[in-house]
């Protein structure tokens, strides 16, 4: 049996903060909520599941892991989920997206990858940042449906390692 999935695109800073944006004046999470309503309708018509990537971004911002407004500078200690165009995801944003998709498709706790997992390392994400993003992904997935808490089941190396030998 084939299972269809839709993932929600996250809120776009370029549609919230500049005066020309469609959601100008709205809180950043409002765009995510509005987009979710549309995805839920499409998913229902296609008998598909929605993967909560946009909600995970909103959670990262509301919990202080990520900055809400890249146009006013990034607050110290917070991650910028957008790249330079404030539309597409940064490395952090795409890593969070991948964690949410991984957990949604497999039903596994994203924290089971461990903070030294090779993808985060190869992307230049620190172990502390990996841990925070894995926690956000887990918290969002837990809120949306059943996921078994199972942090770090893989052997943990002393330090991060590359994904494949060269």
Residue positions per predicted region:
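Structural recognition of the beta-strand scaffold that forms the well-ordered cores
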Residues: 1-3, 49-52, 103
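Cell wall/extracellular polymer interaction/catalysis modules
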Residues: 2-5, 28
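Short glycine-enriched loops at secondary-structure junctions
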Residues: 4-6, 56-57
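Substrate-gating cap/lid alpha-helix
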Residues: 9-55, 77-78, 82-95
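Acidic carboxylate-rich catalytic motifs and surrounding loops in phosphoryl-/glycosyl-chemistry enzymes
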Residues: 52-58, 115-117
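Non-catalytic carbohydrate-binding regions of carbohydrate-active enzymes
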Residues: 61
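Short helix-loop boundary/capping segments
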Residues: 64-66
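Conserved catalytic region of serine esterases and O-acyltransferases that act on ester linkages
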Residues: 71-166
């Amino acid at each position: 049996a084939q299972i269809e999935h839709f993932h929600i695109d996250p809120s776009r800073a370029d549609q919230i903060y500049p005066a020309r944006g469609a959601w100008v004046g709205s809180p950043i999470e409002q765009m995510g909520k509005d987009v979710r309503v549309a995805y839920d309708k499409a998913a229902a018509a296609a008998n598909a599941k929605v993967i909560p990537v946009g909600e995970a971004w909103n959670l990262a911002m509301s919990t202080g892991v990520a900055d809400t407004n890249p146009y006013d500078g990034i607050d110290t200690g917070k991650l910028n989920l957008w790249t330079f165009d404030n539309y597409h995801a940064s490395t952090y944003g795409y890593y969070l997206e991948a964690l949410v998709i991984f957990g949604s498709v497999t039903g596994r706790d994203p924290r089971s990858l461990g903070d030294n997992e090779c993808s985060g390392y190869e992307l230049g994400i620190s172990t502390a940042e990996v841990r925070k993003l894995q926690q956000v992904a887990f918290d969002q997935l837990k809120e949306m449906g059943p996921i078994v808490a199972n942090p770090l089941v893989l052997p943990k190396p002393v330090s991060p390692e590359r994904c494949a030998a060269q």
